[in-house]
Amino acid sequence: MQDHNSTNESFDVIVIGGGHAGCEAAITTAKLGFSTALFTINLDRIAWQPCNPAVGGPAKSQLVHEVDALGGIIGKLADETAIQKRILNASRGPAVWALRAQTDKREYSKKMIEILQNTDNLSLKEAMITELDIAKTEQIGLNSKKILKKRIKGVKTFFGSYYSARSVIITAGTFLEGRIWIGNKSMSAGRSGEQAAQGLTQNLHEIGIKTERLKTGTPARVDKRSIIFDELDVQPSTAVDKYFSFDPDIKNNMPQVSCHITRTTTKTHQLIRDNLHLTPIYGGFIDSKGPRYCPSIEDKIVKFANKESHQIFLEPEGINTPEIYVQGFSTGLPENIQLELLRTLPGLGECKMLRPAYAVEYDYIPATQLQTSLETKEIEYLFSAGQINGTTGYEEAAAQGLVAGVNATRKLNKKDPIIFSRESSYIGTMINDLITKDLKEPYRVLTSRSEYRLTLRGDNADRRLTPLGYQIGLINEKRWSAYQEKMNLLEEEKFRLNNTRLKNTDEISKKIELETGSKIKGSTTLKELLKRPNFHYSDLIKYNLNERNLGSSIQEGVEIDIKYEGYLKRQKNNIEQINRQSCKSLPQEINYEKIETLSLEARENLNKIKPKNFGDASKIPGVSKADLTALLVWLKIREIKKEKANIFVEKKLSS
């Protein structure tokens, strides 16, 4: 590493990578007053959407709402650049409702670049970081043992420039030694058309951080002018008035477009079966694990062999481009077969392929090497966020970027990190899963991963997290005032509904009974009326039982709070009970290998992950309830021994 006399520049924080994690991290640290540099291989591809040009979906939309509630960027940009919006799972309960936006990918990137360029304390740099500079110091630990401490000092670029930093956040996405595959042909690339990040993986190994290999993929893009749309089902934009962001100033002025639906055919399936041996996975060219919840079309045909057809979505990539993203049709087959495959789909019989599908292999850092703050256990002040931690998706990346950015600044300020619990957020659920589970495939957030999904809805993310965002310093005064006003209106409306009664003799009551079939016996409150499954806030408006024109978000929040009041109270009680048990801390210096009352698997996994508390320990694979009980007993015995030792020392000193 170069001498510090040749330092080009010095920063408080350096962020490596300009994807969705890197942008959130850099904006966060800069907004909190720390000089920040964002390094990326290509400044023209910042916050690019190399796979589907969309934000949101089940659980992912909840993540976006949470990032926005804390003061992040992804929700605002998704709202401003959306060219189609839909509510998914609308026929089911509010725990799984999900907003999904089709975005204009070029507009999204353009707006993010503008934000970065106009953020105080933030510099953009085009360079490939190949080396991390680490300072090593010896410290005296427990039992007077010497401990080697490692701390980040700076970074070095491919061409030899050195930049010093007090903290570094790695957000390299799929670029670490990335290699893209089409059939049995491959080339070094982070994604199509962009070079891979070389050298940093080897450096990570040298400084004590392990990496492994994962795979993902993206489908072909076809020219919309070559599609026969009359043969397809139309999927219009149906939720243009719904927003990810809680900021009342965010608006969408983009034209709205439709997506279209086609399906695979028997000819599609046969062509895939005949050519499986030519794909990177089935041909044995690579063996990295791909995402379970976003499989290639060949995986679908093999794993669901009895299924006659699979739905395929045709999604526009923007307003001013002819490119259509063929969602659900990613593949690693050779290019000529890809075109043949596409032309077996209804509506695509004469399609022109603009970009082929490809698979991409890349290095990632297993997140069991991270603390809950996303700081690495091995090196102080070094953080890691996004797809490099084994996740998949822009939303997961953005959430991690914000967390890493917040905690990097808190570390520099000598403050405790902000820890997101499973009970508080999907952010907490995701991070807890990442750092406690030995994942071998790309991780995607799902509503089924959360035990508290009725509490962790998208509509109440601001109620759960905006006070924290304000406390951190990411929510400005204007936004905070808007939040407080919303909370007041929400509580006032719930109070009004609880204290306004209807008598069965009232004319409006007779009308409600006649039209809804809901009998009103004696009298009832508007709250009790709203609790009924076939009565909604829109009915209050219909029967002129609303006092003022409240925004749709307040109407929705009031109705959910009232309709699910019993369930929400029960879940709150469960959370409080779990918190009392799970918050008991576990000292980091414990050597679990020496606790003979634990199972061998529990000893190994506990030593590897080093959980901070019993809650984290309970979620580690291989750690049973019996192991947790044994650990609790061991800790009590340890505490008793310490107390006895202290008493003995005190007696000796006083004698």
From Swiss-Prot:
Gene3D superfamilies registered for this protein in UniProt: FAD/NAD(P)-binding domain, GidA associated domain, C-terminal subdomain, tRNA uridine 5-carboxymethylaminomethyl modification enzyme MnmG/GidA
Short name of one Pfam family: GIDA_C_1st
GO biological process: tRNA methylation; tRNA wobble uridine modification
GO cellular component: cytoplasm
Residues bound to NAD(+): 290-304
PROSITE patterns: GIDA_1, GIDA_2
Residues binding FAD: 17-22
Transmembrane segments: none
UniProt-annotated location(s): Cytoplasm
UniProt keyword list: Cytoplasm, FAD, Flavoprotein, NAD, tRNA processing
Protein's job: NAD-binding protein involved in the addition of a carboxymethylaminomethyl (cmnm) group at the wobble position (U34) of certain tRNAs, forming tRNA-cmnm(5)s(2)U34.
Assembly with partners or alone: Homodimer. Heterotetramer of two MnmE and two MnmG subunits.
Similarity field: Belongs to the MnmG family.
Name of protein: tRNA uridine 5-carboxymethylaminomethyl modification enzyme MnmG
Gene encoding the protein: mnmG
